[in-house]
Amino acid sequence: KLEDSTCDMLNNPLWDEILLISSKTEEDIKYGLDKICTIKKDVQSYSKITLPFIRAYIALKLKNDYVPLDKLNYKKTIDMVHKNDIVLSIGGDNYCYADVNKYIMLHNMMISRGAKTVLWGCSINPEVLSNPEIVNDVRQYQLITARESITYNALKKINPNTILVADPAFGLKTAYAEIPSKFINKNMVGINLSPMVQKEEKISGIIMKNYEILIEHILKETDMAIALIPHVIWDDSDDRIPLMQLYERYKKSGRVLVIEDQNCSKLK
């Protein structure tokens, strides 16, 4: 994951503390991130018997402006950020999603705290930059690291502090992952399939069919084993579901295995 490799890169005596503001703290702790950084929940409770809440509530009811109320959700956590702190936005492709306004709001809150902001390891569809609010937001970053040339070329025109750098995940240290002994010395190919990709298919079942053709080609034309490797394990998008379908179809070959969910260093 991007946050794992980033925290590992920043594990340096120069920094007093590395703080990860997370919407999924339990998941991050499960994968061991609490061992390399401090984890804080992004949204915190707040009192409704305050003037800021009353103002925010009025703005919602009279102007349909939900931003002031949203700010209250994040205020306690973002108040932990101080002047000249370096804040990395690590979502990668956050600006490509429907809730982009939330990230613009959070960025502005960080700037108001006096932080230096970095858009870290990002990918942005150039079409998204037709939105003037996004353009204005992107211009405010002190540094942008784009992880591929399409994003770099688009953002460089807007913010000169844009550089082209490989995704931080490529710098992630690898850890040994246990697999059945018969696979250890085999030449292997790793394959991932995501429900997120399947949801975008134009012809029902075409993605799975293409993966089946790929696996059958590998089994027929090579002596390679195949490792089915999950990447995203969310309630609404679990890679293990389509991967298990592939495994059940080809397990009798004796050359296919499913890698269980584990921390990203082992998956790598």
PLM regions: where:
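Active-site anion-handling motifs in enzyme catalytic cores
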Residues: 1-268
